[in-house]
């Protein structure tokens, strides 16, 4: 009786572990390589942090970007900023967070972050927010 329970427990643990690790690893490796290609294609420099040395300083926690000429709505900025913050937490690369916020969120990295965070079902809502703050 004890050996049957032990064997059953081992089978369940192995099945759960194999299912959990295969999906997570494939998604994160695929997403990471896509993000690396996306970020490297947009910059002419081989150094990923080279844009930080420009005249403007970039603050990761800044909610409002002074370059955005549209309607100032703190709630929309917080919502858009949250996407970039979550994307940074997903990839743990500082240039993901800063590049995501460039051009008032109207860039391909922001779109890729929406895709990687599985927010495609509310894409229109975020696009509307980007258009509102970036007019």
Swiss-Prot record:
The modification Valine amide is found at residue 133. Residues 1-26 form the signal peptide. The keyword Disulfide bond applies. GO terms for cellular component: extracellular region. Gene3D superfamilies: Crustacean CHH/MIH/GIH neurohormone. It comes from the Eukaryota. Its main location: secreted. One of its GO terms (molecular function) is neuropeptide hormone activity. The modification Pyrrolidone carboxylic acid is found at residue 62. One of its GO terms (biological process) is glucose metabolic process. The keyword Nuclease does not apply. Disulfide bonds join 68-104, 84-100, 87-113. PROSITE patterns: CHH_MIH_GIH. Keywords: Amidation, Carbohydrate metabolism, Cleavage on pair of basic residues, Disulfide bond, Glucose metabolism, Hormone, Neuropeptide, Pyrrolidone carboxylic acid, Secreted, Signal. Belongs to the arthropod CHH/MIH/GIH/VIH hormone family. Hormone found in the sinus gland of isopods and decapods which controls the blood sugar level. Has a secretagogue action over the amylase released from the midgut gland. May act as a stress hormone and may be involved in the control of molting and reproduction. PANTHER family: ION TRANSPORT PEPTIDE, ISOFORM C. This is Crustacean hyperglycemic hormones A*. The gene is CHHA*.
